[in-house]
């Protein structure tokens, strides 16, 4: 006997504002049962001696020191820009003033 019924899926769809067909209700009810069975199996295997973790291996960020290096001259950079105003890039306005 399925634990997730068509009525359960229809209720979740309404709450989620999803329009599901009759075929989708049947298919998703079966799929959700399979998913819940898999979660139950994992839950039964994972004991209290297993720490919860988001990754199987520890993650370590590798940082490097900032290094100041020469860059292009301002004039050369602005020469490649499509529009310039007062030694700055000119871009289209996207926000209205109030």
From Swiss-Prot:
EC number: 6.3.5.-
Gene3D superfamilies according to UniProt: Glu-tRNAGln amidotransferase C subunit, N-terminal domain
InterPro entries per UniProt: Asp/Glu-ADT_sf_sub_c, GatC
GO biological process: glutaminyl-tRNAGln biosynthesis via transamidation; regulation of translational fidelity; translation
Coiled coil: none
Subunit structure: Heterotrimer of A, B and C subunits.
Function: Allows the formation of correctly charged Asn-tRNA(Asn) or Gln-tRNA(Gln) through the transamidation of misacylated Asp-tRNA(Asn) or Glu-tRNA(Gln) in organisms which lack either or both of asparaginyl-tRNA or glutaminyl-tRNA synthetases. The reaction takes place in the presence of glutamine and ATP through an activated phospho-Asp-tRNA(Asn) or phospho-Glu-tRNA(Gln).
Similarity annotation: Belongs to the GatC family.
Protein name: Aspartyl/glutamyl-tRNA(Asn/Gln) amidotransferase subunit C
Originating organism: Acidothermus cellulolyticus (strain ATCC 43068 / DSM 8971 / 11B)
Gene name tied to this protein: gatC
